Curated annotation (Swiss-Prot):
Catalyzes the decarboxylative condensation of pimeloyl-[acyl-carrier protein] and L-alanine to produce 8-amino-7-oxononanoate (AON), [acyl-carrier protein], and carbon dioxide. NCBIfam families: bioF. This is 8-amino-7-oxononanoate synthase. It is an enzyme of class 2 (transferase). GO terms for molecular function: 8-amino-7-oxononanoate synthase activity; pyridoxal phosphate binding. Homodimer. Pyridoxal 5'-phosphate binds at G110, F111, S181, H209, T235. It catalyses: 6-carboxyhexanoyl-[ACP] + L-alanine + H(+) = (8S)-8-amino-7-oxononanoate + holo-[ACP] + CO2.
Length: 383
């Protein structure tokens, strides 16, 4: 019986390789700016999520170093023991005030924040309605939760409306993303918020890719659509240039999560130095509008220079998908771009649907106009 696990592992790996969908990790020796270095070769990096360029900011690094000198390197315990310190409390308070919620609860990752909410909130007899293209963390939690999960067609308000009518007698949670990570498009949040209110359902929005980048002072997609969901997830690995996440909600829900969200209760709290640095990142997001302005300029340039390229999708975000179709063709293009010193990532099934493999280009405020032109020229020539 011990061999069953080995056989299962080998079979799964072989199937993935035979389908041309095997993934591998590459050691990046330098890579938190517009360029990265792999195996001694330098590339322009169009695969990261550091949209505002904060990950390489000297100002933010100094804030983290200041936090280390003040609070040490680790929290030493979970939040409900002795791991919750002044920097954590300050960051939660600042986030709640900025985004217009009663409270914020910190988590070590967006994945754990999403799963913690769904696992702790949903019970047998509840209905969970999710956009078909929601993140894997949300889908996995939904499938493993005791609730009945149904998926509505991507950004299809009409389909969501019909599902809400069928679940009107059960407690219902609707979950969508603000910006969809593989397509770079926005959710119709205003319409969805109206529907959930009309049907007495709760709305949860994962704004991992919108917070810091979109909206007034970087407040994200909910600000763009002038809504306040019941639960908002923000993450710190994209616009904030660091890592971690927070759940924003009303005070009663926050108290509930502090008691029953196991990812929060039973995990060592993020280092207080990290929370200190995140508070400074928040200040930079609020005050340094030039970063978002530059992203908009680069976005316009990218779309203009690829306007005749079939498969290049226009989006209002720094996520620019180029739909290729077959996974092997996407890999060929990505490899050809690497030969020219341009690092892009081929996104293949199961991350995206079959026959929709793509090159996922992401832009950063660290990029220059010349960087964008180098990429678009290569894509136009190779495509």
């Amino acid at each position: 019986m011990k061999q069953a696990f080995n056989q299962r592992i080998r079979s799964a790996l072989n199937q993935r390789k035979q389908a041309g969908l095997n993934r591998s990790r590459r050691v990046v020796s330098q890579g938190n700016q517009a360029t990265l270095v792999v195996d001694g070769k330098s590339y322009l990096n169009f695969s990261g999520n550091d949209y505002l360029g904060l990950a390489s900011s000297k100002e933010l690094m100094e804030a983290w170093q200041e936090g280390l000198s003040l609070y040490g390197s680790g929290s030493g315990a979970s939040p409900l023991v002795t791991g919750y310190s002044k920097p954590h409390a300050n960051l939660e308070s600042q986030l709640a005030e900025w985004l217009g919620f009663d409270c914020a609860i910190l988590f070590n990752s967006g994945f754990s924040a999403n799963q913690a909410v769904l696992f702790s909130l949903l019970e047998k007899g509840d209905t969970l309605l999710q956009d078909k293209l929601n993140h894997a963390s949300l889908m996995e939690a939904g499938m493993l939760s005791p609730a009945v999960m149904k998926r509505f067609k991507h950004n299809d308000v009409g389909h969501l409306k019909s599902l809400l009518k069928r679940s009107s007698d059960e407690p219902t949670l609707v979950v969508t993303e603000g910006v969809f990570s593989m397509d770079g498009d926005l959710s119709p949040l205003a319409d969805i918020a109206t529907l959930t209110k009309e049907n007495d359902a709760w709305l949860m929005v994962d704004d991992a890719h919108g917070c810091g980048v979109l909206g007034s002072n970087g407040k994200g997609c909910c600000d763009v659509h002038s809504i306040t969901p019941d639960i908002l997830i923000v993450t710190f690995g994209k616009g904030f240039g660091l890592s971690g996440a927070a759940v924003l909600c009303n005070q009663e829900c926050g108290d509930y999560l502090s008691q029953f969200a196991r990812h929060h209760v039973y995990s060592t709290a993020m280092p207080p130095a990290q929370a200190h640095a995140l508070s400074h990142a928040l200040l930079m997001i609020q005050q340094q509008e030039w970063r978002r302005d530059k992203l908009k300029e680069l976005n316009q340039q990218f779309e203009s220079e690829l306007m005749n390229f079939v498969g290049a999708e226009k989006t209002p975000t720094p996520i620019k998908p180029i739909i290729i179709g077959e996974a092997t063709d996407a890999m060929i293009l990505a490899d050809s771009l690497k030969e020219r010193g341009l690092w892009t990532t081929a996104i293949r099934p199961p991350t995206v649907p079959v026959s929709s493999a793509r090159i996922r280009v992401t832009l950063s405020a660290n990029h220059s106009s010349a960087d964008i032109s180098a990429l678009t020229q290569a894509i136009n020539e190779l495509g």
